[in-house]
Amino acid sequence: MIAALIAAGLLSAFDWSDGCRPVAGSEALWRDDVRYVFVGETHGTVEAPAAFADLVCAALEQGPVVVSLEYPVEFQPTLDAFMEADTEAEARAALAAYPHGPFVHHDGRGSEAMLDLLLRLRAMLREAADMTVVASVPNSPRVEGFRQSYAEMDRAVLWSRQAMAQPHSRLLALVGRVHAEKIRRVGSPLGLPAAAHIRPEETLSLSVAHQGGEAWMCRDDCGGAPIPNVDA
């Protein structure tokens, strides 16, 4: 049901001058007891970042927001420079100056759609939106015998610290689908996903439902890959 709320916002192009598009049914998300809203996506689509931006707009109507994006914490100074630049050209230059990461290798988190999301968030901030944009991938050490499940715990700790730093804000996170899930997948070596480590009464996890199409993915090679048709 909740996943359909995201899917409902994917139908038309966005122009910042037209303002934010309403997301039908999003009022169900803004309960007083919900501190975290996690949006799980398949990286590399056009639609998910656009819908997430609309959801951020809706959240800002309710109060201050922390926007947590799936970039490494080392990327935070670049995010800050992008958001604070005087002009869009300077913002783009700050992003291009980062020596590695998704906007150099262009995986699904460094797509034109994600750049459009960052530009929309920047525009909201320039309109005095009560919002902070933060990176959400911790620098977890790679230690033999300690699998991805430990990185998931680190990610949950980082989210909680971001929330505690601004206790009157709601945290909205856009992450890969698995990190937003609240139970362990059957047979998965991942262990508990990051969102499952946070008190469930304070969290809502959404999953973007796609009706087919493709996503830009980088595995052995980068390119378009089909994504499953999900009945929202």
Question: Which residues are covered by each model-predicted region?
Answer:
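Sec-dependent signal peptide recognition
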Residues: 1-8
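Compositional signal for N-terminal targeting/processing segments
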Residues: 9-232
